[in-house]
């Protein structure tokens, strides 16, 4: 009987020891998990802070000389552009030209679009005016008019813009090109989705043509 009681006591002691070990292991795991969570949150906040600081202090893009002219020509297109006046800015910056702002400060797409020329009223009235209001011009008049026009230095830069564009397109223009390509891709996908499932035949079937011929005869 004494041996059985001793064995029972020893088994109960072992069970208590195992319970103590389990509780100790759980108590040590909880602070470890909390420390890992704190480290993870700190790393995320540090990454967000570094990304924001990089965006805030990143170097601004500048354009000068031929690259500025090529970019203006690409952005404005057929409208043309001017260098001195700027209708979209405040009076403080109205005296500055596009060269001073884009070459020495910073240049973005919105600033370039403000220097695009607007179509004049005369060009708009030509499309609505009747044909009799415009007198016909002879070939000699056209030749003399073309001969007397003077080309400025900006026109010469525009003619030579193809050679300068080979050096690379600025990031502002690349972003606009990518946006236009994405719009074209979306339009093509919508056209494919809205395509009709069935198309009606243009010509009549053969049996209808054969039946219509003897009726005419």
Curated annotation (Swiss-Prot):
Span list, region B: 57-83
Gene3D superfamilies: Insulin-like
Chain positions listed as propeptide in the UniProt record: 124-217
Principal location listed in the UniProt entry: secreted
GO biological process: cell differentiation; head morphogenesis; nervous system development; positive regulation of activated T cell proliferation; positive regulation of cell population proliferation; positive regulation of insulin receptor signaling pathway; positive regulation of MAPK cascade; positive regulation of transcription by RNA polymerase II
Region (C): 84-96
Site (Important for interaction with integrin): 79, 89, 92-93
Pfam short name (any one): IGF2_C
Annotated disulfide bonds: 64-103, 76-116, 102-107
Keyword Disulfide bond in record: yes
Stretch list, region D: 118-123
Record region (A): 97-117
MF (Gene Ontology): growth factor activity; hormone activity; insulin-like growth factor receptor binding; integrin binding; protein serine/threonine kinase activator activity
Superkingdom per UniProt: Eukaryota
N-terminal signal peptide: 1-56
CC terms in the record's Gene Ontology section: extracellular space
UniProt KW keywords: Developmental protein, Differentiation, Disulfide bond, Growth factor, Neurogenesis, Secreted, Signal
Compartment annotation: Secreted
Main function: The insulin-like growth factors, isolated from plasma, are structurally and functionally related to insulin but have a much higher growth-promoting activity. Promotes anterior neural development. Acts as a ligand for integrin which is required for IGF2 signaling.
Annotated family: Belongs to the insulin family.
Protein name: Insulin-like growth factor 2.L
Taxonomic path: Eukaryota, Metazoa, Chordata, Craniata, Vertebrata
Gene name for this UniProt entry: igf2.L
